[in-house]
Curated annotation (Swiss-Prot):
GO terms for molecular function: rRNA binding; structural constituent of ribosome. This is Large ribosomal subunit protein uL23. Keywords: Ribonucleoprotein, Ribosomal protein, RNA-binding, rRNA-binding. Belongs to the universal ribosomal protein uL23 family.
């Protein structure tokens, strides 16, 4: 799988900004079919950094309920928390 298809978009929130400063981790929304090895290779190829570890979180899709009735579905997604090697940083996330 091509690394441009694996990394969908960066995840920028208060939580990810806090963990970036605390523990050199950055977060991405990734393709649900990608595994940890593919995610690691994609980040290393896209940003030219060394990756120490990758943790993934899967959120399954669920029904959207309004007034007791199912009115739609909430899409599921997969997040990857990537820990960078000591001394590495991604310039894209700096200043956020």
């Amino acid at each position: 799988m091509d690394y441009t298809k694996i990394l969908i978009k960066p995840l920028i929130s208060e939580k990810t900004t806090y963990i970036k400063e605390l523990s050199r981790q950055v977060a991405f929304f990734v393709d649900p079919r990608a595994n940890k090895i593919e995610i690691k290779k994609a980040v290393e190829a896209a940003f030219k950094v060394k990756v120490a570890d990758v943790n993934v979180v899967n959120r399954k899709s669920s029904d959207r309920v309004r007034q007791g009735r199912v009115v739609g579905r909430v899409a599921g997604f997969k997040k990857a928390y990537v820990t960078l090697a000591p001394g590495e940083k991604i310039e894209f996330f700096e200043g956020v």
